[in-house]
Amino acid sequence: FPKDSTPYEGLLAPQLQEDIDNGASAGDCTDPDRFSDEDLLQREAAMGRSNFMLQFQLDTTLSDAEKFPLKMADLIVTSVNPTKAPDNVIWCSDPRNVLKDLPTVGLPGDYFYSPMQLQGEWTEYDETICSVDPSGRGTDETAAAYISQKNGFLYLHEMRAYRDGYSDNTLLDILKGCKKYNVTTLVIETNFGDGIVSELFKKHIQQTKQQILIDEVRANVRKEDRIIDSLEPILNQHRLIVDRGVIEWDYSSNKDSAPESRLLYMLFYQMSRMCRQKGAVK
């Protein structure tokens, strides 16, 4: 049952409206024989809040807050250790946790928060990868993200970006970062280049004598949907921890560009304005 009947403007089925009038609680399942309450909670966690509202509550009138589902406030921002992490990281939107010293380029009222508490023993990460988005046909930017995982939490150590396609200098610099963070797997998007980038990486991996597996992925879903479907469930559950240095690096990038174009290249500016509309990503 809907938490707010206003968006439906009298379009609810009479049976549903009657159930609501008789005391059905918001969020309860309308067909318990098909979906249990626990099943719906699991689906909302897996799909993300905005997609769940669209698919399971048929709400097409998303507010601005729901239209842009990737919020900086859902991140946990702290100094990320290169090799170890605690068992659990607690998020809380208490005003005392707002990081007022970090620059924000998100929507009004959207701030970064530090963790409420770090719990448990500090041990090594379960896995560390480097995700590489190569430039398209060698004409635009290449980006690399260094990410570790432990107990279902993702830790973003560092972002790197390059404007010289996939030159030797770029690939070698990415591999230097792999050595710094003990990366075991390179995840490479192969939409452009037809595997050329992977072959170039293999050559440099052999030369640098690093033990890194290469995992090629090919995206066949529109970029905006792919980004939101991947990130929203993680952000809703507050399981992405970002190093402070990533935010500072992002804000200070492209200093020589005009202010309006600088913003368009910023990671967190793009993230906060990401929606399912085509062209949301420039």
Question: How should these model regions be labeled?
Answer:
Residues 1, 191-193, 219:
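An acidic- and aromatic-residue-enriched active-site/binding cleft used to recognize and process polar
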Residues 1-54:
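Acidic, glycine-rich loop-and-beta core segments that form the ion-binding/anion-interacting portion
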Residues 5, 152, 244-245:
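Intrinsic-disorder/low-complexity loop/linker signature
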Residues 32-215, 250-282:
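RNase H-like, metal-dependent nuclease domains and their acidic two-metal-ion catalytic environment used
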Residues 213-257:
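Short alpha-helix plus adjacent loop in nuclease-associated cores
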